[in-house]
């Protein structure tokens, strides 16, 4: 709503406003019920943004907590709401016992209230669901262990758009209510002034839909959460009187008493009535947005209450004056916690909850509340702001927050890699604890005791890694929307915890789990410099591959080698297997070794690389001299069991002449790579700068040939956009190369096409071929089985092709990838993942705005791991899988656009910095193309395999000889009896960190937290979108499970004390607390 005033003096504005307030909008009829105002004191404390996390804590947060706690202790009428547990936990640990006891009393009195309770307020657009769960668990476990508190209210007031994932997860955490804020302002507000007129705006205002029952998931239709949208942001109330004719006379007055005193003057005897009138005017405007007579009114803002006295003292005067004049104002105000507001709303509207018995995971569903609207299966992307000056320039709202989906790509990539590494560390640490505890019970061996000391150190390292992972979920961290110094600090933290985990956690535990004798002083490393450091003929290296998924796996891996090195590869049974050496022209001509690796579920498999030739030397000349006294290897070699690897055929592809490349269908120019399931066909295209370009696909399973599909780099020219906002100046164009080069790699295992656009921009297409091994597993397919069913072949590396995209952007350029296929008529409908499930997107104009740059930006959506288009008639489907987030869209029929990297000279007013991304990341994607039914069977497992790669751990074997090595170490660690079924994902297996304080007993062992997810959506797959029934005892190998309890998602509430047999429906998730020991 907009107001126009006329006048030239500030004092005249005050008189005009005061007169207006006192005459009409303040008077209250005796027939009107009193408006109950729940004033919610709070401070929004970003976990990094304009300052680093450390700076915010030491310079701001400590002041806030110290002063607020002091104020609340002195005055029981005062209340405060706190969200970011990362700051509170640190502050709490810095306090003495006396102050801690005071805080406990404030919490008990409900003066100090925790809302949300996560480590931070995570971004909702591009943060992976496992990272969200982990950061919420961090906060919830601290609150539960220290205070017995179980948060019930979501508080996501600053992320740039609410996702359907968040209410789904929050409901599984036991939340009843949810508060959100940043949604498209054209949905919230009516813009109908002459100077800023947006047709159809303000539906929430018109229909009073600022509160609703949100049913976020079509796969879990009974999950719902009562949701409140902040009507006017989370800051202290203010009112702006807009003068469009004379903008300099626009007048804002508010109640942010730590803010600008000209706008937020302190309360005095002289201005008390006027200021009270203004606050009541704000209240009465806002209460009309709701369907009851209760108003949640935020009182605070970014890092507010550093001076809690000035905030509370000024507001005290207003509260006292307004409440004492209730007949005049019809308003009653009180300091409140967020739950008090919801309790009153529920009381007034008769909403109740009952247990939902229709699902396999325990949750509640609402009864009553018919007066509230219901929102189903919809999220609130893209968040859009409407700025007056921006509107005057473009005659439309053009601030679409779809840029941060792709901003600072390298940060997004490293963050996701760090989460994958943490996941491996958590699994390994849990198994090491189980085995170590069993050894200590059986044998008080000094070596085991030494390892227990290491486990404590390892635990501390993982705690720090977990904490940093939580920090990176913050809505200004992974988004790339913080200042450069803060972003650099995030990267520094990530690199430090990754280094600690890689160097001090994973190698030590892998060595421990593989040992079959007492621990040896043996050097395991996550770094393959031991291979790269001038290997000699006869050198032997072991590589132990760690699998963090609950499925047996068989897939291709790549290991870097020194140039001109020939090797032989042996598997865990010491049987020689095929391998291929490839020179990667997109990676500075570096040399890589490819071979197939098989690993058991959650297990480890060891492979051996033997240097057989360097610089054309050959080991066959004198075997005894090369391998010394390693009798086992000499025996294997002399009996012809070892063989050299199959070398790749490398050829540079010359440019074709213009006559032969003038037609995209010219057979003489077509170049093909493929396997037994498909071929990729490439041609030189004049319309694409005569670049070698993917032009068609042969489906050898369906006997369909030359199916049109193209892919190439595109670039947008920036138009005043920044790390938050995407505002391209027009449609994308094909990226123009500089002296391009093309290479083809052929071989029996892997084939590649590499296209070098520039020195720092390239694409490499990778196709894998089946291989036959002489091991007990004779296929490259990964197998799985249900409890009593035979193995089913489902996943293999021939089902997809990879594209390694190495990208860089010049100033005011935004680089992406465009796929196009005439065989898919998707009618501009596409699907993006929120991490757990696909959300349908439809290319459309918003609020009748067909401005070109808004049609582009407003139809880009966040992708966590999957984007796809399909043709429902032909059943053709194109699916792109990724292990990092970015923005994507379908702007034309049969088209998918992915936006990888952005760079702009525009200085966003808040950051006052350019978006200067000079990184050169490699972004790997998996591509599935073909029959829709076939793809839907396999896309979700393939996505998890991509996101959770095998981790290689290296060691030098030749120092002690291989026969001694295998006498000390097992080549396989297999903790599960059998692989999980492919629709069942083991999401979490981690050791409980701390007992609840009031139940603490050092003699009680800590339990283990475990989560399972049925990964298939309803109707995704006829074969796999089925309920799964399983028992944990059928899987854990040599471990004894004595107690299984179902809990909330963050393990702070027991739901079922006896959970032996588990049933999971499609896309259901269950959390368990188990007592387990080694047999």
Curated annotation (Swiss-Prot):
GO CC annotations on file: extracellular region; lysosome
Binding residues annotated for Zn(2+), in chain numbering: 44, 46, 158, 475
Glycosylation sites: 60, 96, 192, 222, 248, 467, 516, 527, 589, 760, 769, 848, 872, 912, 1040, 1057
Gene3D superfamilies in alphabetical order: 2.60.40.1360, Glycoside hydrolase 38, N terminal domain, Glycoside hydrolase family 38, central domain, Golgi alpha-mannosidase II, Golgi alpha-mannosidase II, domain 4
Active site, per annotation: 158 (nucleophile)
Entry note: cofactor: Binds 1 zinc ion per subunit.
SUPFAM superfamilies: Families 57/38 glycoside transferase middle domain, Galactose mutarotase-like, Glycoside hydrolase/deacetylase
Keywords, ordered alphabetically: Glycoprotein, Glycosidase, Hydrolase, Metal-binding, Secreted, Signal, Zinc
Membrane-crossing residue ranges in chain numbering: none
MF-aspect GO terms: alpha-mannosidase activity; carbohydrate binding; metal ion binding
Broad EC category: hydrolase
Keyword Signal part of the UniProt annotation: yes
Needed cofactors: Zn(2+)
PANTHER family: ALPHA-MANNOSIDASE, ALPHA-MANNOSIDASE C
Family affiliation: Belongs to the glycosyl hydrolase 38 family.
Name of the protein in question: Alpha-mannosidase C
Organism: Dictyostelium discoideum
Source species taxonomy: Eukaryota, Amoebozoa, Evosea, Eumycetozoa, Dictyostelia
Gene name of the record: manC
């Amino acid at each position: 709503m907009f107001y126009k005033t006329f006048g030239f003096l500030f004092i005249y504005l005050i008189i005009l406003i005061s007169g207006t307030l006192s005459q009409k909008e303040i008077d209250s009829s005796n027939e009107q019920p009193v408006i109950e105002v729940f004033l919610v004191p709070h401070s929004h404390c970003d976990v990094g943004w304009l300052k680093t996390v450390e700076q915010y804590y030491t310079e701001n947060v400590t002041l806030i907590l110290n002063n607020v706690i002091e104020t609340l202790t002195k005055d029981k009428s005062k209340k405060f709401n706190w969200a970011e547990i990362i700051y509170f936990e640190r502050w709490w640990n810095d306090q003495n016992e006396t102050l801690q006891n005071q805080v406990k009393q404030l919490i008990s009195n409900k003066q100090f209230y925790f809302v949300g309770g996560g480590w931070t307020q995570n971004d909702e657009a591009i943060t992976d669901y496992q990272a969200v769960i982990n950061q919420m668990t961090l906060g919830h476990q601290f609150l539960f262990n220290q205070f017995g508190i179980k948060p019930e209210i979501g508080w996501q007031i600053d992320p740039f758009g609410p996702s359907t994932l968040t209410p789904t997860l929050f409901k599984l955490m036991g939340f009843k209510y949810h508060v959100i804020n940043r949604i498209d302002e054209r949905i919230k507000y009516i813009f109908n002034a002459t100077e800023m007129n947006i047709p159809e705006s303000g539906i929430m205002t018109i229909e009073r839909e600022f509160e609703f029952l949100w049913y976020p998931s079509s796969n879990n239709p009974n999950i719902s959460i009562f949701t409140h949208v902040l009507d006017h942001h989370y800051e202290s109330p203010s009112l702006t009187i807009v003068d469009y004719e004379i903008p300099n006379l626009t007048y804002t007055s508010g109640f942010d008493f730590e803010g600008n005193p000209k706008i937020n003057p302190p309360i005095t005897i002289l201005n008390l009535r006027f200021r009270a009138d203004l606050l009541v005017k704000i209240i009465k405007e806002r209460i009309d947005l709701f369907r009851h007579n209760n108003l949640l009114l935020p009182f605070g803002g970014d890092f507010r209450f550093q001076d809690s006295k000035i905030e509370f003292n000024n507001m005290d005067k207003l509260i006292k004056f307004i409440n004492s004049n209730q007949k005049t104002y019809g308003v009653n105000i009180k300091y409140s916690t967020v739950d008090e507001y919801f309790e009153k709303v529920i009381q007034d509207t008769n909403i109740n909850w009952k247990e939902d018995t229709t699902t396999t995971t325990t949750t509640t569903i609402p009864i009553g509340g018919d007066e509230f609207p219901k929102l189903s299966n919809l999220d609130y992307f893209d968040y859009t702001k409407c700025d007056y000056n921006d509107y005057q320039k473009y005659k439309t709202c053009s601030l679409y927050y779809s840029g941060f989906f792709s901003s600072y790509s390298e940060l997004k990539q490293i963050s996701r890699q760090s989460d994958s590494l943490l996941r491996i560390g958590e699994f390994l640490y849990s198994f090491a604890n189980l085995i170590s505890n069993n050894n200590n019970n059986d044998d008080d061996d000094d070596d085991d005791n030494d390892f227990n000391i290491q486990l404590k150190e390892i635990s501390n390292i993982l705690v720090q890694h977990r904490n940093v992972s939580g920090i990176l979920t913050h809505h200004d961290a992974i988004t790339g929307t913080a200042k450069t110094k803060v972003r650099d600090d995030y990267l520094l933290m990530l690199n430090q915890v990754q280094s600690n985990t890689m160097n001090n956690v994973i190698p030590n535990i892998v060595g421990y789990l593989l040992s079959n004798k007492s621990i040896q002083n043996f050097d395991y490393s996550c770094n393959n410099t031991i291979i790269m450091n001038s290997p000699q003929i006869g050198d032997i290296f072991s590589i132990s591959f760690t699998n963090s998924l609950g499925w047996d796996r068989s897939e291709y891996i790549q290991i870097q080698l020194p140039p001109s090195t020939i090797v032989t590869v042996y598997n865990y049974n010491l049987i020689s297997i095929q391998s291929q050496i490839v020179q990667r022209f997109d990676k500075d001509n570096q040399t890589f070794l490819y071979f197939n690796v098989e690993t058991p579920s959650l297990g480890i498999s060891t492979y051996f690389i033997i240097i057989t030739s360097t610089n054309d030397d050959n080991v066959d000349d004198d075997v005894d001299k090369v391998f010394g006294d390693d009798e086992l290897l000499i025996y294997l070699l002399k009996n012809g069991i070892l063989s050299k690897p199959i070398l790749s055929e490398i050829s540079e592809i010359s440019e074709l002449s213009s006559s032969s490349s003038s037609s995209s269908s010219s057979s003489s120019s077509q170049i093909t790579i493929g396997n037994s399931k498909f071929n990729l066909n490439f041609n030189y295209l004049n319309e694409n700068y005569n670049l070698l370009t993917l032009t068609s696909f042969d489906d050898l399973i369906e006997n369909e040939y030359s199916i049109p599909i193209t892919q190439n780099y595109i670039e947008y020219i920036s138009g005043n956009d920044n790390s938050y906002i995407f505002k391209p100046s027009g449609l994308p164009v094909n990226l123009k190369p500089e002296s391009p080069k093309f290479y083809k790699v052929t071989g029996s295992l892997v084939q590649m096409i590499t296209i070098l656009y520039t020195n720092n921009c390239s694409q490499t297409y990778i196709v894998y071929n089946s291989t036959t091994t002489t091991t007990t597993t004779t296929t490259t397919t990964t197998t799985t089985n249900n409890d009593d069913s035979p193995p089913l072949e489902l996943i293999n590396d021939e089902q997809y092709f990879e594209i390694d995209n190495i990208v860089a952007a010049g100033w005011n350029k935004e680089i992406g990838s465009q796929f196009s296929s005439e065989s898919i008529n998707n009618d501009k409908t596409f699907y993006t993942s929120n991490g757990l499930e696909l959300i349908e997107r439809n290319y459309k104009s918003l609020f009748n705005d067909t401005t070109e740059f808004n049609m582009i930006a407003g139809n880009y959506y966040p992708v966590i791991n999957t984007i796809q288009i399909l043709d429902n008639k032909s059943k053709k489907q194109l699916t792109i899988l990724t292990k990092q987030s970015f923005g994507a869209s379908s702007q034309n029929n049969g088209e998918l656009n992915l936006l990888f990297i952005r760079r702009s000279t525009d200085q966003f007013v808040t950051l006052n910095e350019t978006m200067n991304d000079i990184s050169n990341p490699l972004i790997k994607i998996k591509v599935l193309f073909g029959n829709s039914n076939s793809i839907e069977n396999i896309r979700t497992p393939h996505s998890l395999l991509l996101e959770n790669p095998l981790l290689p751990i290296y060691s030098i074997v030749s120092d002690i000889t291989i026969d001694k090595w295998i006498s000390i170490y097992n080549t396989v660690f297999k903790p599960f009896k059998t692989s999980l079924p492919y629709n069942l994902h083991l999401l979490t297996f981690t050791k409980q960190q701390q007992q609840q304080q009031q139940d603490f007993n050092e003699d009680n062992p800590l339990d283990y937290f475990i989560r399972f997810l049925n990964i298939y959506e309803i109707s995704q797959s006829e074969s796999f979108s089925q309920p799964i029934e399983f028992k944990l005892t059928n899987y854990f190998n040599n471990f004894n499970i004595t107690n299984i309890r179902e809990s909330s998602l963050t393990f702070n509430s027991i739901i079922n004390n006896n959970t032996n047999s588990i049933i999971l429906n499609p896309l259901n998730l269950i959390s368990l607390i188990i007592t387990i020991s080694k047999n």
